[in-house]
Amino acid sequence: MFLEMLNPMQYNVTIMVPETVTVSAMPLLLIMGLLLLIWNCESSSSIPGPGYCLGIGPLISHGRFLWMGIGSACNYYNKMYGEFMRVWISGEETLIISKSSSMFHVMKHSHYISRFGSKRGLQCIGMHENGIIFNNNPSLWRTIRPFFMKALTGPGLVRMVEVCVESIKQHLDRLGEVTDTSGYVDVLTLMRHIMLDTSNMLFLGIPLDESAIVKKIQGYFNAWQALLIKPNIFFKISWLYRKYERSVKDLKDEIAVLVEKKRHKVSTAEKLEDCMDFATDLIFAERRGDLTKENVNQCILEMLIAAPDTMSVTLYFMLLLVAEYPEVEAAILKEIHTVVGDRDIKIEDIQNLKVVENFINESMRYQPVVDLVMRRALEDDVIDGYPVKKGTNIILNIGRMHRLEYFPKPNEFTLENFEKNVPYRYFQPFGFGPRGCAGKYIAMVMMKVVLVTLLRRFQVKTLQKRCIENIPKKNDLSLHPNEDRHLVEIIFSPRNSDKYLQQ
């Protein structure tokens, strides 16, 4: 009787055994599943790079870009994992490439013409599917690019020489406006004013307040750089991005007023040929329905900010190098005397200024301003044996490539690096291919014009032991001097041009 009473309990215990085993095995099975998931994530890509680690890897890599800046983070990861490696930005797989053959492949093919960046960030600065610089709508970009190419080549390039020379001379005559009580010249401000004035005369032709707009351009650039790869959560907290939004609005409102003045000028012109330029072509395209008002305003904004944003800093670095290397300055001046003499530079002189060109190239190689290019793959591909999926982000680390391959003295500033013709696959300061810089030819000519005109009139000096290496820099979207800190002081000493050039 007693044993019979125990039987149900015995049966119940027997039934409970598999349930107990199943429950106790669950944590083990979960751990095994997670390990399998991690293993799959780690082994799914043959491209070197940090591990996925349950999503922690993407968070850390994106955080590093936000903390260090895009350019500095790219150099860090290429140094850590090699010249073709993979990280994540905003959770998206991103390749960082500093290998010339891979870079050549990306620049060459049309399925890499799209850019990448935060959609919210690009919308905030007006570049999302608009303008030319970061327009990631290939169809609209193809519609807009010909307007830039027409303005930046051919007759526009020829006219630029005379316009730029006059602008430089006028600003040098007013050098006191950018010189402090100690005699130091604010070269960055001087160059930004010259670049803006020249761009305005060539592409818009409406009187403007240079000082006010230069400051607004700096605010716009800071917003662009700050917002480009910010995560979406950043834009859910309005007080975090409000100051950037204001900076963008300040410049866009200013440009809108200038464009309206241009529209009025075009509408009331007695002779239309007197006001034909880049802005006029865009306004006519809007009237035909090819572009919107927003397209026109953004294109003009980007045309006006391009030179003050990058070329002014490039020229600032070049003048520091001239001051640091007197033997290079002597070679440049000798060539100026031989080719140009005591007259203003002309378009015919440009191709004969070989030493000046080598100096410009070596300066851009040794101390670049724009040292990376951001692209997105529009279709599946294979680059140097590595599979690349459609939608993959790509950063071309051009500045690092210029220090790794081909050049005999890659870590030194010397014109010897350009004594021989450099194959263009190894030197790409402006990029090439279907999405290469539209302004690369006019930029080279403009830099020659500025250097020749300025160096014939002034000798550039810095304080002893102050040089380009001493400048605090920020390597983010581009490499700029940190203007929040004290920059290297530069003195412009007038010289007897004829006597000096003949030495």
From Swiss-Prot:
Compartmental location: Endoplasmic reticulum membrane; Microsome membrane
Protein species of origin: Mus musculus (Mouse)
Pfam families linked to this entry: p450 (PF00067)
UniProt-recorded name of the protein: Aromatase
Binding site for substrate: 309, 374
UniProt xrefs under InterPro entries: Cyt_P450 (IPR001128), Cyt_P450_CS (IPR017972), Cyt_P450_E_grp-I (IPR002401), Cyt_P450_sf (IPR036396), Cytochrome_P450_Monoox (IPR050196)
Lineage, opening ranks: Eukaryota, Metazoa, Chordata, Craniata, Vertebrata
SUPFAM superfamilies, alphabetized: Cytochrome P450 (SSF48264)
Entry's family note: Belongs to the cytochrome P450 family.
